[in-house]
Each structure stands twice: as C-alpha cells, then as structure tokens.
Amino acid sequence: MSRSARRKTSALNTVLRVVEVFASIQGEGPFTGTYSVFVRLAGCNLRCPFCDTRYAWSLEAGKPLGVEELVEEIARYEPSLVVITGGEPLLQRHPLNSLVEGLESLGLRVQLETNGILPAPARDEQLWRVYHVVSPKDVPVRVPGAKLHPSWVDYARATGRAWFKFLVANEQHVREVAEYVAKLGIPRSRVYIMPLTPEKLDMKELLELHSRIASLAVKWRLNFSPRLHLLVQLP
C-alpha cells in the first residue's frame, strides 16, 4: 500500500458520522439508571416500522467528527458510562474501534447497542472488551432482513459481556423469545424482555404496559427491562 493510501485509510478509521451526543440516564438493559453519555452514530441496515430514531437511518444524517474531537466532547460530561447507539453502530466498525480505544484510555466504560446482524467483535478488536446489548429483530417482531449472526452467542459465552434484549407486546411474544433463546443456548440470565411501546401512549397506558410485561417476565423467569427514560421523560 502506498503512503498516500495509508494516510487515506488512517483518516477513514478516525472519522465517524455522528448524529448526536447527549447526556441522560441509560433507560434500558443491564445498566438501567446509570448516568450516561449517548453517542448516536448514523446509518442503519434495518428499517424497523416501530423505530423511534428514523432520523439516524441514513449515513448522510451524521456529521463527520474526528475520534479525538469526539472523545474530548464525551469526556466533558464526566459520564459513568458511554453508550454507543444508532442506527447500527457496527456499520462504522473501523473508526468505532478507534473511538473505543480513545475512551478506554480515559478509563471510561463503554456499552454498544447493536441489532446483531453484523458479526461480533474478534479478539484482536478494541470492541472485544466493551459491553454489548444485542437486540435481535428476527424474533418476535420479525423485521425483514434481520437475522442474528451466530457469532454473538459465542461472544457472549466467551466474554460474559453481552446481553440479549427483545421487544415484546404480549405473552405470545415472550413465549417465542423463550423458545428462541433455548434453541440457541443463551442463558436466561443474559436475556431481557422490554415493552414494545406504540407511539402516543399517555403515562397511564405506558405504566400499565410496563406492569404487564414485567409480570410476564416473572412468569417466564426472564429479566425485565423498563424504558425508564420514557417513564421519567428524559431523552
């Protein structure tokens, strides 16, 4: 590879297309309630009809930001956790590894949210060491084109740093999740079910939905994830 080509590759690996950076609490999954900085990356490989961040679907929706500049912006918030979300963050895999390296150099914990279509990190990637919350969309919501890459199950077993989170609306959905994780050999301790929230629910309806899904989690011996940020009206 020529010197100019190497410079070009290096530049690509240190620039991310970023939709937004903001502070909130992590409202979902194993780190619920943690003060966090969210980094929303542009681009997604799915078109989920229930998606509440459609503005991040296109790669062009993001502003190009250098990794060093982005790390400095994140550090100013002094977060307990950095949540990298999307879109689908792994579409920007190479610069994402550079971002993780920069964040870890500051001693920051990193959690990545993914739909699990793309392969799990390899051992030689910076991403191998971060926490992952995988939200498969092939069960029970069945989004076209969604299929969990089998490497995520192996990654979870090898590292203990991955959890699987499923959107559910009723008991049939929960039954499908239970059958799915049993077939793949995913321990229930690594599985969360979370309410699939339609648009325009008032607070009473939102609380009732959370109560129903939480009761189903107990019945089926699964972990329950609220959507805490919705309940407390944070971004």
UniProtKB/Swiss-Prot annotation:
Residues 31-235 form the Radical SAM core domain. One of its GO terms (molecular function) is carbon-nitrogen lyase activity. Its cofactor is [4Fe-4S] cluster; S-adenosyl-L-methionine; Mg(2+). It catalyses: 6-carboxy-5,6,7,8-tetrahydropterin + H(+) = 7-carboxy-7-deazaguanine + NH4(+). Binds 1 [4Fe-4S] cluster. The cluster is coordinated with 3 cysteines and an exchangeable S-adenosyl-L-methionine. [4Fe-4S] cluster binds at residues 44, 48, 51. Its EC number is 4.3.99.3. S-adenosyl-L-methionine binds at residues 87, 135-137. InterPro entries: 7-CO-7-deazaguanine_synth-like, Aldolase_TIM, rSAM. Substrate binds at residues 25-27, 40, 85, 235. Mg(2+) binds at residue 53. Belongs to the radical SAM superfamily. 7-carboxy-7-deazaguanine synthase family. Catalyzes the complex heterocyclic radical-mediated conversion of 6-carboxy-5,6,7,8-tetrahydropterin (CPH4) to 7-carboxy-7-deazaguanine (CDG), a step common to the biosynthetic pathways of all 7-deazapurine-containing compounds. Homodimer. HAMAP family: QueE. PANTHER family: 7-CARBOXY-7-DEAZAGUANINE SYNTHASE. This is 7-carboxy-7-deazaguanine synthase.
